[in-house]
Every structure is written in C-alpha cells, then in structure tokens.
C-alpha cells in the first residue's frame, strides 16, 4: 500500500492524483508503461519571478478538466487506448541544492530510458531540461531540439544553474545539434552565431502553420528529437502565470496546431516548463500547459497507431 507523501528509494514522492487522472506508479522503471510523467518542482535557476516549483501541481490539478474527454477533438481515438501512460509523481531533492536536483533528475531519466520508457516532464523552471537532455543524449546520441519559447536560452553568462543558459551549454556538451534544431516563438535578444534556426514570433504568427511545420521538418530531418515547450512562448493574454512573460507571443490555438504538426518527427522526450501559478488568472496558464502536454501525448499515440 502506497502512502501519500512517502519518499521512496527512487527519489520520487506520490501525489493525490496523476496527470489526467492517469494511474500513479511510484516504481515506474519496472512498469509496462510506454510514457512516464515526472514532475520537477524546481525554480532555483529562475531570473525573473519565482514560483515554477508549483507548476507540476498546478498542471496536474487543472488536468482534471481534460480527463473526461476520451475521443478528444479533433482526434478520432482515445490516447489512453494506444499509449500506456503513468504518472510517477515529483522528483524529491534537498530544497536549496540545485546540483542534487540535477543529478537525481538525470539519474531518474537514465534509469527510465534504460528500461525502455519515454518521458514527459513538467517543470519547474527551464533549467530542468538540461539534465534531461544529458540523460537522453546518453541513450539516443546527439539530438535535434524543437524549442518553443519567448527566449533562446543561449546566454553565456557563466552561471552553472540558470534557466537562460541550457541551450548554450547543451551544444557544447554534444547533446544537441544546433544545425538541426529550431527555436519557435522567440521575441527577445538572441545571437545568430549559436547555429539554431530561430523562427521568431512575428513570422510564426504571420506565416501559415503548414509552412512553419514544413520548415521544422526540413531542419530536423530524421534525427531523434527532444521537444521542450516553455509556456512563455504563448502571449501573456493566454499564459500570464509564468516567470518572464513577453508580449507579442503565440496564441494557444496556434501553439496547439504547431504541436499537432510535429506528429511525424522522431520525438524521444518532451517537457512543458515555466508555469508559475501564483501569477496565473483563473488557471488559464496551467490549463494551456496541461492541454499542450495532452496534445504531445496524442501525437505519440497517433504515430503509434499508424
């Protein structure tokens, strides 16, 4: 019998209910799951407004509003009938110890991937993507990155733990190939010398969804893909509850259509990050994040059903 709040040897802790009311499994490595959801309640690398540590709980809470819909529009099937998805709760680490969080998250991810599972992770600030990339690169080799964000997170400020430096560090460690990676929705300062293809928010909003998706597919090719979605990619009208909001972003409708268009890519890992519910209004940011996460699972289910 599992006890709520009990810490297990695998450094996970239970939650009252799983994302989308999916089954909780606190020993996911030995399960028959295809995809495992992990919450990472960490916001010590935040440069703006803190509070992302509460993101996983907010995403799970609001996801109950989505749980009732089995044949989700516009899909003609129930994702849960094609994918075995479990929620293993949140990573446990000594609060205040960013290095321990990073090491434990990487170890957890490596163990899941070695067991043949795939991961959907909830942040937390965007720094959590770096240890996840390290684990995925060990298993899949160098990857392409598909990155939705208002910021490129390629800043070289010398900080070890900073949610704006991961995609400066990751190419230098050989985790991702910038020449096959794309950043979508950017509308802040960026350095073109980093090698990423940047599709800024202005052009993504002006171009057709099909046109943008075609370019993403051409850039990525057949490489294994890590998909990361910082919720501040959305305009603050649709996602006010985040640490570093920037006006002029994507609508939630356009973001969902873009995610659906990634179905044919070889996506090996996914995350949704930077939900800070203290700044949210009527849970709309958490709902956007939960819906995008659900769409990510649907594109995996659609591909499996082909």
Curated annotation (Swiss-Prot):
Q: What does it catalyze?
A: agmatine + H2O = urea + putrescine
Biological or metabolic pathway of the protein: Amine and polyamine biosynthesis; putrescine biosynthesis via agmatine pathway; putrescine from agmatine: step 1/1
Q: Which GO terms describe its biological process?
A: putrescine biosynthetic process from arginine, via agmatine; spermidine biosynthetic process
**EC nos:** 3.5.3.11
KW Protease (keyword) present = no
Write one Pfam family the protein is assigned to: Arginase
The residues the record assigns to binding Mn(2+) are 126, 149, 151, 153, 230, 232
Note the InterPro entries from the entry: Agmatinase, Agmatinase-rel, Ureohydrolase, Ureohydrolase_dom_sf, Ureohydrolase_Mn_BS
Q: Which UniProt keywords apply?
A: Hydrolase, Manganese, Metal-binding, Polyamine biosynthesis, Putrescine biosynthesis, Spermidine biosynthesis
- Provide any one GO MF term from the record: manganese ion binding
Q: Which Gene3D superfamilies match?
A: Ureohydrolase domain
Q: Name what cofactor the protein needs.
A: Mn(2+)
* Recorded family membership: Belongs to the arginase family. Agmatinase subfamily.
Question: What is the annotated role of this protein in its UniProt record?
Answer: Catalyzes the formation of putrescine from agmatine.
- Report the protein name in the record: Agmatinase
What species does this protein belong to? Escherichia coli (strain 55989 / EAEC)
Lineage, top ranks: Bacteria, Pseudomonadati, Pseudomonadota, Gammaproteobacteria, Enterobacterales
């Amino acid at each position: 019998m599992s006890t709520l709040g009990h810490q297990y040897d695998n450094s996970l802790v239970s939650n009252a209910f799983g994302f989308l009311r999916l089954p909780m499994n606190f020993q996911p490595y030995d399960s028959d799951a295809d995809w495992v959801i992990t919450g990472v309640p960490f916001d010590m690398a935040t440069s703006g407004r803190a509070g992302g540590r509460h993101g996983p709980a907010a995403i799970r809470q609001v996801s109950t509003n989505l749980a009732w819909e089995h044949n989700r529009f516009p899909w003609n099937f129930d994702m849960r009938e094609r994918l075995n998805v479990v929620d293993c709760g949140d990573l446990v680490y000594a609060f205040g110890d960013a290095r321990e969080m990073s090491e434990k998250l990487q170890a957890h991810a490596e163990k899941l991937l070695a067991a043949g599972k795939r991961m959907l992770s909830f942040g937390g600030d965007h720094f959590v993507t770096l240890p996840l990339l390290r684990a995925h690169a060990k298993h899949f080799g160098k990857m392409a990155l598909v990155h939705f964000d208002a910021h490129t997170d390629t800043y070289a400020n010398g900080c070890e733990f900073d949610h704006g430096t991961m995609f400066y560090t990751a190419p230098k460690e050989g985790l991702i190939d910038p020449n096959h990676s794309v950043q979508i929705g950017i509308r802040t300062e960026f350095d073109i010398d980093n090698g990423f293809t940047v599709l800024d928010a202005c052009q993504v909003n002006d171009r057709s969804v099909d046109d943008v998706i075609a370019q993403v597919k051409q850039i990525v090719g057949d490489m294994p893909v890590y998909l990361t979605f910082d919720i501040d990619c959305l305009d603050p009208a649709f996602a006010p509850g985040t640490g570093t909001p920037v006006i002029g972003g994507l609508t939630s409708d356009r973001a969902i259509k873009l995610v659906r268009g990634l179905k044919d890519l070889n996506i090996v890992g996914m995350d949704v990050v930077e939900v800070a519910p203290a700044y949210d209004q009527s849970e709309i940011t958490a709902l956007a994040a939960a819906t995008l996460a659900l769409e990510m699972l649907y594109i995996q289910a659609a591909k499996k059903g082909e």
